[in-house]
């Protein structure tokens, strides 16, 4: 009986987590406002006068974005949308 309760609780947790996920839409990036700005390599030498054109992404850059700085580690990358 305890095994059935554990399985039932695990299934309910999986259902709750999957119901909270938002659909992945390429034209709508909700998390942009929550990102932190960062300085790309070509923004200029001084951080105070440079325009911060990149955003910090944990892990690696999102699909369709490019890594624009070489000074971030495996934990985070400075990324931006490719310039046309």
Swiss-Prot record:
- Pro-sequence residue ranges: 20-33
Gene Ontology cellular-component annotations: extracellular region; nematocyst
Where is this chain primarily localised?
A: secreted
An example of a GO molecular function for this protein is: toxin activity
**Keywords assigned by UniProt?**
Cleavage on pair of basic residues, Disulfide bond, Ion channel impairing toxin, Nematocyst, Neurotoxin, Secreted, Signal, Toxin, Voltage-gated sodium channel impairing toxin
Which positions carry the signal peptide feature in this UniProt record? Answer: 1-19
Where is the protein localized? Secreted; Nematocyst
Please explain the role this protein plays, according to its UniProt record: Binds specifically to the voltage-gated sodium channel (Nav) and delays its inactivation.
Q: What is this protein called?
A: Delta-thalatoxin-Hhe1a
Q: What organism does the record attribute this protein to? A: Heterodactyla hemprichii
Q: What is the lineage of its organism?
A: Eukaryota, Metazoa, Cnidaria, Anthozoa, Hexacorallia
């Amino acid at each position: 009986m305890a095994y059935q309760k554990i399985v039932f609780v695990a299934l309910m947790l999986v259902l709750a987590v999957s119901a909270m996920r938002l659909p992945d839409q390429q034209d709508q990036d909700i998390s942009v406002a929550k990102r932190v700005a960062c300085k790309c390599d070509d923004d200029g030498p001084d951080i105070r006068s440079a325009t911060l054109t990149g955003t910090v992404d944990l892990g690696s850059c999102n699909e369709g974005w490019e890594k624009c700085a070489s000074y971030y580690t495996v934990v985070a990358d400075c990324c931006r949308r490719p310039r046309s």
